Amino acid sequence: MFETEKEVERVILVAVDDGTNEFDAESCLDELEDLANTADAVVVGRMIQKLGAINRATYLGSGKIDELKAFAEMKDATGIICDDELSPVQIRNLENALNLKVMSRTLVILDIFAKRAMSAEGKVQVELAQLRYNLSHLTGRGKEMSRLGGGIGTRGPGEKKLEVDRRRIADRISDLNKNLKEIERHRSLLRENRNNQTPVIALVGYTNAGKSTLLNALTGAGVLAEDKLFATLDTTTRAVETQSGANYLFTDT
């Protein structure tokens, strides 16, 4: 993966309330704001549109797009983050209408992953996810992304480079898959060398639920624990011996 020089992204959060989501739009945007902050963006506003159905071409209605464009100019925004997953056509049409970079929740999460991954396996997995995401969202976006600059989504493989040579992307994905299989094979060998009788306990929970904090309290592992979404991306396993002499392996998933 490659990282660009850090830029401060000023973003507006956008959601469509079509009545199908079990969570209300404001709650979804609250979490999206946490994600944006974790990705080092500055949230300067939010906007929700109630629609019977999401517009397949532009995500938002034409009137709301005009309102959003004026709001973005007033707030000096540099980008828009939509709570929903957008199609390549929706992204292209919104970027053309707003003259701003348009991002989805998925792109923000992948950007956070690119920043947080520390292990070789984690970095390979994140780059694979970025390449696959970008490959599926290339349609007509090379020019727009080049014009709209860096920020969120520019950690990892760049859009302009991806647009130039799809075959190289496929080759890179193939190479990364081979690397990942080799890493997994090495990990399997390490597992076989461990005492197979030792119980393994996995700490499972939503992001920022406190898994790393609990692992540190139980084992003294010293794993990074912050009040941020996806603060820990890589898996950590530590051995613990109880007062009775029993041994356990705790894994921060």
Task: Name these PLM-found stretches.
Residues 108-129:
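Short alpha-helix plus adjacent loop in nuclease-associated cores
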Residues 4-11, 141-253:
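Conserved G1/Walker A P-loop phosphate-binding module
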Residues 125, 129-147:
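Interdomain "pre-motor" coupling segment immediately N-terminal to P-loop NTPase/helicase cores
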Residues 1-111:
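N-terminal accessory targeting/assembly segments
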Residues 19-24, 54-58, 116-121, 160-161, ...:
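Flexible beta-alpha connector loops of hexameric P-loop NTPases
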Residues 32, 131, 169:
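A residue-level signal for conserved active-site and pocket-lining positions in enzyme catalytic cores
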